[in-house]
Amino acid sequence: MTDLTTQEAIVLERPGKITLTNVSIPKISDPNEVIIQIKATGICGSDIHYYTHGRIANYVVESPMVLGHESSGIVALIGENVKTLKVGDRVALEPGIPDRFSPEMKEGRYNLDPNLKFAATPPFDGTLTKYYKTMKDFVYKLPDDVSFEEGALIEPLSVAIHANKLAKIKFGARCVVFGAGPIGLLAGKVASVFGAADVVFVDLLENKLETARQFGATHIVNSGDLPHGVTVDSVIKKAIGKKGADVVFECSGAEPCVRAGIEVCKAGGTIVQVGMGQEEIQFPISIIPTKELTFQGCFRYCQGDYSDSIELVSSRKLSLKPFITHRYSFKDAVEAFEETSHHPLNNIKTIIEGPE
């Protein structure tokens, strides 16, 4: 007899060990809740970091946790107060649920709510299951021309959208992106769509830089392969002008990149710090006031970012399909994590299909 109370899930048992494990199927307990049948989930760098290290900053995996937060699917069940969605709707889901009455929620900056419940961030389970329960306010209908795979990648795209909004990108802007990982690639691509004239990518790895070139980089700089005495900022300024960059997206979290970003940003320019690295680093703070730089933190996304991301993809101003390099069935998800963690250079985005 089929067990209708449990479902398979991809569970991080402890650092280095992921299993396919049975967990309870969620039930509606609040009239504003929605249950989604998950159809596609992207593997995020945070998933890999929890898998390999068991923690990110102060978020520590202390008990088994379902992984995954970049997901899309079909509405399977709705609470009685849900009027904007119906069973069968194709949707993307925002994985962070704030306190609906928090000051941050009222300000439209719910990503800063200290009580935010974010999928696959300890102690909260993620979306790599067949059915996942969330709140109606954080479920977005997908247009018919946006696939489930693209719907899953609305989540990282929203990070890039948020970063560009914080940067206040203007037409003709000169931008530099440090770190050519998925978020960096998307941040640069969005900057181009928003009207940036130059998008320079900086990374240590040549294959990542070649990928950045394929995604529209106007210039690439291999910071690990410069002649003795040549600095990153001097190479960038030679390419885009000696005044430097209007906007710097720091997407690596690495101290040398933070320092170089401060050097290369023009007077009056903006640095958007997207990457999270060591808790403490050293950088030339005196440059920030003397150049009147805006040093802007960026954390996930908030009001309007998901909707704008879906519109950008649906309008075909930006395609997410080229970012998908690997696909796995749900039953092969453990292999997907092992492959992604052991061979990251061959991967931009891995998609895991939802369970059958």
From Swiss-Prot:
The gene is XYL2. The lineage of its organism: Eukaryota, Fungi, Dikarya, Ascomycota, Saccharomycotina. This is D-xylulose reductase. NAD(+) binds at residues 179-184. InterPro entries: ADH-like_C (IPR013149), ADH-like_N (IPR013154), ADH_Zn_CS (IPR002328), GroES-like_sf (IPR011032), NAD(P)-bd_dom_sf (IPR036291), PKS_ER (IPR020843), SDH-like (IPR045306). It comes from Saccharomyces cerevisiae (strain ATCC 204508 / S288c) (Baker's yeast). Induction: By xylose. It catalyses: xylitol + NAD(+) = D-xylulose + NADH + H(+). Zn(2+) binds at residues 44, 69, 155. Gene3D superfamilies: Medium-chain alcohol dehydrogenases, catalytic domain, NAD(P)-binding Rossmann-like Domain.
